[in-house]
Amino acid sequence: TQESQKGNVGYKKVRTCRANRHPLQWCRKQRTEVLMMNQAKFVVDIEACVGCGKCVKVCPGGILRLNPSQKAEIADFKEFGWNGCWKCEHCLAVCPMGAISIFGHRPENSLPMVDCTIAAPAMDSLIANRRSCRRYKDKNVDTAVINDMLGRLSGAPNGGNKQQVEFTLIDDRVQMDHFRQIVYSRMEALAAQGIYPKGFSKEAYEDMKRWEKTVRPDMLFCGAPHILIPHAPFGHGEPIQDVVIAGTHFELLCASRGLGAVMLTFPLGALEQMPDIKAMLNIPAHHYIGMIIGFGYPEIQYARGVQREMEQDRIHRLAFEKAPI
């Protein structure tokens, strides 16, 4: 064993099975790995590492380097974040030899890279065919499906990879109906007093009421059996952008699984007029909330995508004859 004298970084040679990386006593095939004894559990397979330096170039925290033997290693750091490990796992993802593991995650357990010839048309179709869903079946989405989608949101981009977005969820339609009735009753009582959801006039409110007869079963949550509310604290990362990105990714995840989803701001305006009921959500006051996402199994299936076109006057290309001084 060789230990560093510096901070939380050390080196420990570990003999493991070449085939499945079990401890040596379980298998005769030997492979040597170097375990960096630090908070990130950064592990380099020194036999597989070819010293290409790709991990060094993609590390946003700048804490990876090649040692004199041209093997990847991690520098000491005091805490995760700006001047330490960002927990992005770019090193694990970029290594062409699969020589890097981190946080106990091994490269062989990662999802394979997508074939762009397959992914591009699938993504194009997904974006063109997703619709805001305003009518839902009175049916719960399986909890395993919801949990899987929430887990996928850990891959959504966010400022500094701080992973500050939290998710408040109603995943049972009975509970959702209960909450809907509470909010709706108060909203109607306030409207009778001339107090309407924030940002809505009497005329706009009456329009929403009229549309309940055709477009949506209820003006608040479109009859959705579930809602998801992404929110993030101010003062950390980029809460506004992070919340919007997480919400957009969740909507696409719903679309890819045959679920309908709709991004709602009207209920936020209603809840602003009833702080006691808003408090039932248990979302901290210093958190940014940009939307409430209703989702579930769609009552109406669409037959095809729309044929929207991008107006060219919405695209502004820049070109400079001389670089700015």
Description of each model-found segment:
Residues 33-325:
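Acidic, surface-exposed loops and disordered segments
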Residues 11-14:
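Short linear segments in intrinsically disordered or otherwise low-structure-confidence regions
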Residues 2-4, 30-32:
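Short, basic, low-complexity termini and linkers enriched in Ser/Thr/Gly/Pro
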